[in-house]
């Protein structure tokens, strides 16, 4: 939607009007379970794109799309009556791709989790290629002092 608040408010109002009309006033038997997800308006408020989703298979999607196209005039006139704008925006219905995109992302996350589990299983049974601790540590004698810290001159003095 454009950046101005009037377009945002009008888009929200159009979304409410169209959703209410589809639920209560449109009696087309081809119309399935349609959900209006968003409305985007052009900057001049002349064209509104109504995004929708349909619950069901491809046949229900096709019949609901045809029902929306046939009810477009009635919906536009009702939008004009209820919004009171000088020029009622034209309505264009477009299937919302968000559910398909979400399903694709979820599938990618499932694949990544499966790969992570596979790598974790391999890492649990893996052995080090070299020593377990490859870093050099100073040698420690029995007194708890490291051999590097001891002064060699002290060891050579007679007691």
Swiss-Prot record:
InterPro entries (alphabetical): KH_dom-like_a/b, RbfA, RbfA_dom_sf, Ribosome-bd_factorA_CS
Location in or out of the cell: Cytoplasm
GO cellular component terms given for this protein: cytosol
Source domain of life: Bacteria
Main location: cytoplasm
Keyword annotations from UniProtKB, A to Z: Cytoplasm, Ribosome biogenesis
Entry's Gene Ontology BP terms: maturation of SSU-rRNA
Composition-biased stretches (Acidic residues): 142-159
Annotated GO MF terms: ribosomal small subunit binding
Entry-linked Gene3D superfamilies: 3.30.300.20
Region (Disordered): 127-159
Complexes and interactors: Monomer. Binds 30S ribosomal subunits, but not 50S ribosomal subunits or 70S ribosomes.
HAMAP family xrefs: RbfA
Similarity comment: Belongs to the RbfA family.
Protein function: One of several proteins that assist in the late maturation steps of the functional core of the 30S ribosomal subunit. Associates with free 30S ribosomal subunits (but not with 30S subunits that are part of 70S ribosomes or polysomes). Required for efficient processing of 16S rRNA. May interact with the 5'-terminal helix region of 16S rRNA.
Protein name (database record): Ribosome-binding factor A
